[in-house]
Amino acid sequence: MAASAPPPPDKLEGGGGPAPPPAPPSTGRKQGKAGLQMKSPEKKRRKSNTQGPAYSHLTEFAPPPTPMVDHLVASNPFEDDFGAPKVGVAAPPFLGSPVPFGGFRVQGGMAGQVPPGYSTGGGGGPQPLRRQPPPFPPNPMGPAFNMPPQGPGYPPPGNMNFPSQPFNQPLGQNFSPPSGQMMPGPVGGFGPMISPTMGQPPRAELGPPSLSQRFAQPGAPFGPSPLQRPGQGLPSLPPNTSPFPGPDPGFPGPGGEDGGKPLNPPASTAFPQEPHSGSPAAAVNGNQPSFPPNSSGRGGGTPDANSLAPPGKAGGGSGPQPPPGLVYPCGACRSEVNDDQDAILCEASCQKWFHRECTGMTESAYGLLTTEASAVWACDLCLKTKEIQSVYIREGMGQLVAANDG
């Protein structure tokens, strides 16, 4: 028998001390035993050093707080749900979870309704909740998200008229109607949990109608009101805007009837009321019915302060009501006096219209004259050729009467 060679030095490097001296020559059996005795402690020590941390890691951190995919097997939802201590520990995080489905997943009755990967309680619950929220809307809360119901107990989608509300309003208002309606259904186990905190079953019927009423009622005021307001405003605008002075709104009706008649009297007859009628004071104090309608036409043409004097000129016939063939020449330049031009009526005597530029009056003076209701203007020709009273008094009907005559 040949003697066995000593063990190679690489197998003996694991020890801390120097390699032992070679064994004295002996039989092969003794040398083999010595080799085994020398190698076995090293192998055990080596294995314990390499594999020990792995075992300790698994035992110390199992189940890990944030399990990975390979550790999901350790947190079985069915085992966790039926374990009394684990359910108690997992209930607080789920009840306080801001996610709308947190409260539902603690119930044990949910295990049969939802796939195992989605209804988890206990230690590993929060992770599936965080990683797998999308499957929940169709399963437990289908109606609330406007999705087809998954169980016989869920209310039809038609009753849930607020698909967008769960995201815009507090959970209490959105989920309470579903909870009230789902109590007799397969998710009846959740009723006791939801009803104490946010259970208001009447809202299941009141919520959708309130939405429809809320949209229907605003529609009613918004729809009719724009139509009514313009309708109400239109009738009020003509009387307010057409006669500038303000007391004239009563006269446009009669004026419309008599508008064609007094076209010639202002030029042919010179009784004091017609001269006065052209002045702004005539419109303020109340004049013959025929003139306010004309003033309304004039007022519409020039909505400035200057329009107060032209009303009298419009009473002469240049308003929209008189025939278009009439022309009112300026007393100075003999050109036509248009509605859009500043014009002054000689109320004192000749009853002729004059352009403001032809009389040499400034805009500021013209504004003061037209805004003064009791002012009476006379042209230069009448002042030179006629005796014009310096003071005139307007009577109740707005007629001009000389102070010395009265």
Curated annotation (Swiss-Prot):
One of its GO terms (biological process) is regulation of mammary gland epithelial cell proliferation. Residues 164-179, 285-296 have a biased composition (Polar residues). A zinc finger (PHD-type) spans 327-385. A motif (Nuclear localization signal) lies at residues 41-47. It is found in: Nucleus. PROSITE patterns: ZF_PHD_1, ZF_PHD_2. Residues 1-73, 106-323 are annotated as: Disordered. Its main location: nucleus. Gene3D superfamilies: Zinc/RING finger domain, C3HC4 (zinc finger). The modification Phosphothreonine is found at T302. Binds to BCL9 via the PHD-type zinc finger motif, and thereby becomes part of the nuclear beta-catenin/TCF complex. This is Pygopus homolog 2. It comes from Homo sapiens (Human). The lineage of its organism: Eukaryota, Metazoa, Chordata, Craniata, Vertebrata.
